[in-house]
Amino acid sequence: MSGGQRLEGKTVVLAVTGSIAVVETVRLAHELRRRGAVVQAVMSAAACGIVHPDALTYATGREAITRCTGMVEHVLYCGEGGCADLLLVAPCTANTIGKIAHGIDDTPVTTFATTALGRGMPVVVVPAMHESMYRHPGVVENLAKLESWGIDVVPPRIEEEKAKIAGIEEIALHVERALLGRPLAGKRVVITSGACAEPVDDVRVLTTRSTGQMGRALALEAYRLGASVTVVHAGHVPCVENVHVETAGEMMEAVLAGVGKGADYYLSAAAVSDFAPARAAGKIPSGAPVEIALRPLPKVLDAVLRIFSGTVVAFKLGWDEEARAAAMLDAGVAMVVVNTPPAMGAAGGEFVLMRKDSRRTVTGTKEEVAEAIWSALL
């Protein structure tokens, strides 16, 4: 199980209810299968009125269940000893949320839910409805009740007065998190990612080619494993807290605040600026040579090591960095990940994971390398 196949060997029951968002479930089924899962669709009558069962039969490669028969499908999948590993109710209407919360099972979906909850198997609910329905006190109370039972409720996107179904990637990440054992449950992780940009003038910046792919992969892997994750960067990663910064100074401030709030891990995957120019007002005229003086900037990693007692992972970029990496290990870094410049912006590459007592070379995609890093830390 590695890279994109995090759900290999897992069976997910995709229970579909009568929200217009049911049109997204074909894509969702494909994504879960791409990640390795066996997917079995179960549909309410209302869902069948929006999307034909044949569409989900095609998307899953298994005949969609539209009614519970004498074969007791709900027990075969979600009962004691059943073959399913997780029940995913997506989309989930206000009506179905209320029925699950009160033990009512008068549709195939709610019957599967009652059975799954009685067995104690993981359940993920993905609400989708108009915003006014989502704000109804009874719906709010019912969702809180589901969460108190251990059900994972995936927050909707509030747009255009609608509580729209969460993105496909976000739903898949919640499924992975529910099925991977959560070895990082209760842990707080702070990760820096991507490039900083130091203003040269009001138009131009000094930056690097870093894309943030490694930081993103590390953050998503930590989330899958159950951690509470904060990413300090200029981009966006789903399912985590995103703290947006531009300059190295802003990153320094955000990181020190983050690790000071009880963090357990700090992973320094950003290409933090080493130098910054004095910012010129307006726009420097073009057409003539320009000399730009650069001043060195304080190191974020050094500042973290002075105040943070948790686990620190650093990254070193270069062709001959292992001697410097050894010095970083002596300074208190738990692991140094060494990679070469060609890996910057690429989908993968060769990385060396260095610890005081071990050295391991990992070659693969950045998602696979992130998995290897967290596996080594745990």
Task: Give residue ranges: language-model regions.
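A cross-family phosphate/adenosyl-ligand binding-site feature
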Residues: 1-378
